[in-house]
């Protein structure tokens, strides 16, 4: 039976609330077991919380360098001007209230043999099981002329917070008639629909305040997530495909940005075309966060292979890798995927510490994109292990995508669903 959108929201909402749907065992009070979680983003915070909820006797330590976490999801609304940066900032007091030890330090090494996590501050944390949620590392040097230092002028804004604010200010400072270049990388990367939602939000701001301006997307890929839905929205809102289009899309490997000159504010594509811009939003290629590389958890492509039933590393036993860093195709690298994977890993960790076989999990994802205040679209899916447990597959006839010809009331409702989802997931993760 195909789920309609209302039923899917109900189903996924219930899954967020009900720990048992992800196979958690009943409460078990073990003796002095320790779990160290490295990384306090959506995946890591979720895993830490749900391990502690499932078995309060487990000593859970979360190691995260930042005292506040800014969600990438809904950060594009900050760039578009309809949301304040503070609204996507979240702290860790909620996790502390559950009895989790939160250590604000950077993990610098993991010894899988001695079962130790080392930090920049010189501390060592022993563990029985370790969960690594390192997020992504941006590979700046894949683009000639780009670097972490250059990102202060040529923001990626693919890690929310300061970078989000930089990009927003540049748009505010730009004169009417200016050009904004957005350059997404080739897949895989964090939040596949993100660059196109960003283009929409930038166009929304420019249409209202700087209507002579233009957004140019220089895309490494030929296709993108929710492409038909985005294209329809761009046509309706921003004149896409017309002579007066506010958004231009240049697809394919030849359009990939390979060189940037921050002084001249110029980018060059693989084909050799040059584009001068007033604002350059350059999103570089990505790989698993640095600690995953240091710990030897990555493959040659820079991502972390895992057992999809437990998210235990295929390289180092006793270490589970979740979120953007892990290989969990066809699940996208998204906040909701990280939350879902955090719960699956938590259930597996608790079971394994009891000497039990973890249950068979299911996984959820929904990605909302807001093109304008009353124009939202989404894609949703339920996933499960395949027959032999070697890979993740989509459950047939589950989830769905916003119809291309959806009426206005549906598009407006999607925005409200997005806000409700956001409030629920941040409470579920950090509350």
From Swiss-Prot:
What cystine linkages occur within this chain? 191-367
Report the catalytic activity.
hydrogen sulfide + 2 Fe(III)-[cytochrome c] = sulfur + 2 Fe(II)-[cytochrome c] + H(+)
Q: Which GO terms describe its cellular component?
A: periplasmic space
- Name the residues that bind FAD: 70-76
Note the SUPFAM superfamilies from the entry: FAD/NAD(P)-binding domain, FAD/NAD-linked reductases, dimerisation (C-terminal) domain
Describe the protein's quaternary organization and the partners it interacts with. Dimer of one cytochrome and one flavoprotein.
Q: What is this protein called?
A: Sulfide dehydrogenase [flavocytochrome c] flavoprotein chain
Recorded name of the encoding gene: fccB
């Amino acid at each position: 039976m195909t789920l309609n959108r209302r039923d899917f929201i109900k189903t996924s909402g219930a899954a967020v609330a009900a720990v048992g749907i992800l196979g958690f065992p009943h409460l078990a009070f073990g003796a002095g077991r320790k779990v160290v979680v490295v990384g306090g983003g959506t995946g890591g915070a979720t895993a830490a919380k749900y391990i502690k909820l499932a078995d309060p006797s487990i000593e859970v330590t979360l190691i995260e360098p930042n005292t506040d976490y800014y969600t990438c999801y809904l950060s594009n609304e900050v760039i578009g001007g309809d949301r304040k940066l503070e609204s996507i900032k979240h702290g860790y007091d909620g996790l502390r209230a559950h009895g989790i030890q939160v250590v604000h330090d950077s993990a610098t090494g993991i010894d899988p043999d001695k079962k130790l996590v080392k930090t920049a501050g010189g501390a060592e944390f022993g563990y029985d099981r370790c969960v690594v949620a390192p997020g992504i590392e941006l590979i700046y040097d894949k683009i000639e002329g780009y670097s972490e230092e250059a990102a202060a002028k040529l923001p990626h804004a693919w890690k929310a917070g300061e970078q989000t604010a930089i990009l927003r200010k540049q748009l505010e400072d730009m004169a009417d008639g200016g050009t904004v270049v957005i350059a997404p990388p080739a897949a895989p990367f964090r939040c596949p629909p993100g660059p196109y939602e960003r283009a929409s939000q930038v166009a929304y701001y420019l249409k209202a305040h700087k209507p002579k301006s233009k957004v140019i997307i220089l895309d490494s890929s030929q296709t993108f997530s929710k492409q038909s839905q985005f294209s329809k929205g761009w046509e309706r809102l921003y004149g896409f495909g017309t002579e007066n289009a506010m958004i231009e899309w240049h697809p394919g490997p030849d359009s990939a940005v390979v060189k940037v000159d921050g002084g001249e504010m110029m980018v060059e594509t693989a084909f050799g075309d040059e584009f001068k811009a007033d604002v350059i939003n350059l999103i570089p290629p990505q790989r698993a966060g640095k600690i995953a590389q240091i710990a030897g958890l990555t493959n040659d492509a820079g991502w972390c292979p895992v057992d999809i039933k437990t998210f235990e590393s295929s390289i180092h036993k006793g270490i589970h890798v979740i979120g953007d860093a892990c290989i969990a195709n066809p699940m996208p690298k998204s906040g909701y995927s990280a939350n879902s994977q955090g719960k699956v890993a938590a259930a597996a960790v608790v079971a394994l510490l009891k000497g039990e076989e973890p249950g068979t999990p299911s996984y959820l994802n929904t990605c909302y994109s807001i093109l304008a205040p009353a124009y939202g679209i989404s894609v949703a899916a339920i996933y499960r292990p395949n027959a032999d447990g070697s890979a993740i597959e989509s459950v047939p006839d589950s989830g769905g995508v916003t119809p291309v010809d959806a009426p206005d009331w549906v598009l407006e409702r999607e925005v409200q669903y997005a806000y409700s989802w956001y409030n629920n997931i941040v409470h579920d993760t950090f509350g």
